[in-house]
């Protein structure tokens, strides 16, 4: 089973993917996580990504993104492992590249208002150890400023600051909205109301998967 979650930053793709992988035999493929892992390396690819200023809200070029995503997806397909794509593809060129080697079974579009996105993104804090995500508005840690899992001090990513969020949403409107139009004629395309709580978004998707196996 090959699932795509598509939607703007802050729509809940990561959180929903986490819930789906926890309760199903699915692997979570997040380009954000893949890039963060690469940035820890001393490699030419890491240096290229750093030069792009991802932390300032800029998107990595399609050529690099396709290379990184294909490497991860090819391995899963080779092992016949079901997976969820989160954050890829996000442009028409990326979608066309993906279609060359991967047929998606479900395309879930997380539809959400911009006002709700700003609230979610600027209120988001992250654990440096386990990558757990919290939000000061609706997913607070048990102890202020500390991760529930490992008690590490939470931090706010540079791309979750207000200025960077505005850039990310502008980039999304310009590059990813055309992708929605590309997919919405596909019979596997399902629109989900992502303004509701993450748990409800997850339940809607999980129920759909159960009913349409």
Swiss-Prot record:
GO terms for cellular component: cytoplasm. Pathway: Purine metabolism; AMP biosynthesis via salvage pathway; AMP from ADP: step 1/1. It is an enzyme of class 2 (transferase). It catalyses: AMP + ATP = 2 ADP. ATP binds at residues 10-15, 124, 133-134, 196. Keywords: ATP-binding, Cytoplasm, Kinase, Metal-binding, Nucleotide biosynthesis, Nucleotide-binding, Transferase, Zinc. NCBIfam families: adk (TIGR01351). Monomer. Belongs to the adenylate kinase family. This is Adenylate kinase.
């Amino acid at each position: 089973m090959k699932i795509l979650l598509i939607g703007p930053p802050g729509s809940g793709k990561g959180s929903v993917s986490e819930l789906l992988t926890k309760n199903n035999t699915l692997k979570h493929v997040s380009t954000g996580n893949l890039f963060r892992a690469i940035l820890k390396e001393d490699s030419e690819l890491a240096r290229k990504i750093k030069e792009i200023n991802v932390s300032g809200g800029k998107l990595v070029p399609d050529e690099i993104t396709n290379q990184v995503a294909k490497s991860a997806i090819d391995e899963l397909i080779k092992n016949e492992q079901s997976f969820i794509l989160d954050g890829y593809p996000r442009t028409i060129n990326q979608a066309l590249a993906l279609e060359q080697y991967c047929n998606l079974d479900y395309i879930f579009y997380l539809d959400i208002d911009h006002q709700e996105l700003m609230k979610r993104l600027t209120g988001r804090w992250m654990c440096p150890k386990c990558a757990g995500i919290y939000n000061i508005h609706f997913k607070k840690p048990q102890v202020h400023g500390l991760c529930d899992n490992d008690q590490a001090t939470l931090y706010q990513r540079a791309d979750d600051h207000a200025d960077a969020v505005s850039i990310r949403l502008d980039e999304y409107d310009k590059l990813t909205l055309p992708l929605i139009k590309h997919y919405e004629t596909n019979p596997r395309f399902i629109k989900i109301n992502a303004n509701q709580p993450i748990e409800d978004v997850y339940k809607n998707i999980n129920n759909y998967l159960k009913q349409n196996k």
